C-alpha cells in the first residue's frame, strides 16, 4: 500500500480485490502465491491507516461461497489438496456455468454490498 500511496495522485483511486477469511487459507493459496486473507474490516483498517478513504467495500464470490467453504473444510480434514490447487483448466461448459454467479453478483453489487464471500473488494481514494 505504501507504493500505491506514493505513485497515486492526490484523490487517485485504488481498487483492491483480495482473498477473504484466514480460515479459508489452503494449499491453493500457496500455489497461487497468496500470502494473506482479510476480513472486510481488517482490509478497511489497513486502507485507512495508509492514507486512503474507502468509497465502497464489500465481499464478493458470495453465491459460490458455501461450495468453496465446504470444499476447503473437507480438503483440510482429509488433507486432500496437498497435490493440486484449484487453479486448473476447467471444461468450457462448466466454466460458463460457474461464470453465471459472477454475472449475477456484478449486477447486485451495483446497488448493494454483499455480507460475506471468498473475496473482499474495496474501492478507495487517496487523501
Q: Predicted regions span which residues?
A:
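Short catalytic/ligand-binding loop motif for oxyanion handling, primarily in non-cytosolic enzymes
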Residues: 23-26, 63-67
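A structural motif corresponding to the C-terminal end of an alpha-helix
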Residues: 49-52, 126
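A C-terminal cap/extension of S-adenosyl-L-methionine-dependent methyltransferases
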Residues: 64-127
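Short secondary-structure boundary/capping segments
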Residues: 6, 23, 112-114
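Short, glycine-/aromatic-enriched active-site segment of Class I SAM-dependent methyltransferases
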Residues: 14-36, 40-46
